[in-house]
């Protein structure tokens, strides 16, 4: 990675950290939310061997529009059209009911750009590992299992994107008795 890539990624991390600064995970420790997008970016870099800086940027920013006051226009103006487009490809419409958002994720997964599919895969892997580590407050064992089953449906539509990440997801699904 060259110096300008490092500077770009640090600027992206700083932007995401500012946007997510008051958010916490639903785990008992109240982990800072920024750990999630950083973890998703790290999975892409370290496990998926992704070196495309724009994909890593999109991973760092993937929840900013969905969960903060960030707009796609702001992302495009600060980080460029490609990063904004990748983030758009992984962003749910929060105005829709949760069940409809989940249905759309399954339906839209096969039609995303390759770059958006990478972010989706890493996001699912991070979330499933997190659920194995610690059940969110208010979640039953059944809800966790249902999340795994739903995530497997999304991941089915992302097959052929990144063998290393898909293999790790497959292992998690097998451990849970969920067919892919």
Curated annotation (Swiss-Prot):
Transmembrane segments: none
The HD domain, residue ranges: 33-128
PROSITE patterns: HD (PS51831)
A GO term for molecular function: guanosine-3',5'-bis(diphosphate) 3'-diphosphatase activity
Catalytic activities: guanosine 3',5'-bis(diphosphate) + H2O = GDP + diphosphate + H(+)
Chain positions recorded as Mn(2+) binding sites: 36, 62-63, 123
This protein's record includes keyword Manganese: yes
SUPFAM superfamilies: HD-domain/PDEase-like
Cofactor (UniProt): Mn(2+)
Active site: 66-67
Function noted in UniProt: ppGpp hydrolyzing enzyme involved in starvation response.
UniProt protein name: Guanosine-3',5'-bis(diphosphate) 3'-pyrophosphohydrolase MESH1
Organism of provenance: Danio rerio (Zebrafish)
Lineage: Eukaryota, Metazoa, Chordata, Craniata, Vertebrata
């Amino acid at each position: 990675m060259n110096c300008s890539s490092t500077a770009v990624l640090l600027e992206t991390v700083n932007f995401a950290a500012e946007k997510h600064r008051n958010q916490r995970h639903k785990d008992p420790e109240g982990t800072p939310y920024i750990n999630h997008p950083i973890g998703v970016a790290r999975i892409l870099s370290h496990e998926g061997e992704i070196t495309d800086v724009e994909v890593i940027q999109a991973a760092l920013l993937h929840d900013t529009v969905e969960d903060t006051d960030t707009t796609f226009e702001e992302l495009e103006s600060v980080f460029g059209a490609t990063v904004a487009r990748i983030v758009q490809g992984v962003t749910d419409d929060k105005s829709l009911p949760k069940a409809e958002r989940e249905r759309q994720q399954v339906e839209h997964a096969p039609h995303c750009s390759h770059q958006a599919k990478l972010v989706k895969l890493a996001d699912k892997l991070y979330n499933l590992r997190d659920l194995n580590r610690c059940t969110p407050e208010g979640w039953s064992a059944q809800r966790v299992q249902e999340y795994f089953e739903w995530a497997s449906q999304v991941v089915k539509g992302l097959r052929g994107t990144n063998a290393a990440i898909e293999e790790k997801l497959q292992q998690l699904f097998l451990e849970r008795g969920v067919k892919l």
